[in-house]
Regions:
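All-alpha RGS (Regulator of G-protein Signaling) helical domain and cognate RGS-like helical scaffolds
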Residues: 1-135
């Protein structure tokens, strides 16, 4: 059962890392169309810090973090910066919702719980309000 739990947590870390890559590259795609657009520039950088936090969890477990399945080209361009902001609201809501069920798990390792809690909080209390203001 222990091996299964470890594998489940590994799959969970992969899923979380891809979720953060997705957010970063979504915002990178907006910056390609609207160079320097705020809040995308700062939040895209923040998403890279989220990726790094998750990559450290892999390293701590002597696992190689996977590369992103996402690129900026994965996303269709937004018609306007306001539409991009609405896309940011949707993405950050999905990000926060992604972490919610996992944070309820009793067997979630403490280091994973801490990172997931921080990433969910960043989505809810920093990124989401910034995108709501720019819609």
């Amino acid at each position: 059962a222990l091996a299964l739990l470890v594998l489940d947590h590994a799959a969970l870390l992969v899923e979380a890392l891809q979720e953060e890559y997705k957010a970063h590259f979504l915002y990178a795609s907006v910056l390609e169309a609207y160079p320097g657009a705020m809040p995308f520039a700062t939040i895209a950088e923040s998403e890279l810090r989220h990726v790094e936090a998750l990559q450290k969890l892999f390293t701590r477990r002597q696992m190689a973090p996977p590369a992103s399945v996402w690129t900026a080209a994965s996303f269709d361009p937004f018609a306007s910066i306001q539409a991009a902001c609405a896309g940011g609201v949707k993405a950050e809501t999905e990000d926060a919702d992604f972490y919610a069920p996992y944070l309820k798990l009793d067997d979630l390792p403490q280091d994973v719980r801490s990172v997931f809690t921080n990433l969910q909080a960043a989505s809810l209390y920093n990124h989401l309000p910034a995108f709501e203001r720019c819609q």
